[in-house]
């Protein structure tokens, strides 16, 4: 792990979108707001994303692609980039985690870790 691997901090806030969910059809919509903070000394460009999404039944799906929400932002030192996206699960509980493929101002490629976070409907867990 290089110093660049730890120069990016990822914070996550989740929300269950009840009005667009359909529990009777086993469809639970969640939004997640991601804040990517550059704690390093160089600007870093987010080039790719890789998500691993697991529902309460153990079903796993992967999402890979360029950028996030149609953008490949460059995050200057001591600044943050924020976006909101969403996912649909077949269960009222799930977990997401993954990585962002980043490239530093000096051209070094590195991975920013997105630690596991829970997606859950209100009141399901105490």
UniProtKB/Swiss-Prot annotation:
Record InterPro entries: ApaG_domain, ApaG_sf, Uncharacterised_ApaG
Signal peptide residue numbers: none
Pfam annotation, one family: DUF525
Residue ranges constituting the ApaG domain according to the UniProt record: 2-126
GO biological process, one term: error-free translesion synthesis
HAMAP family linked to this entry: ApaG
NCBIfam families per the UniProt record, alphabetical: PRK05461.1 (NF003967)
The protein, known as: Protein ApaG
Gene: apaG
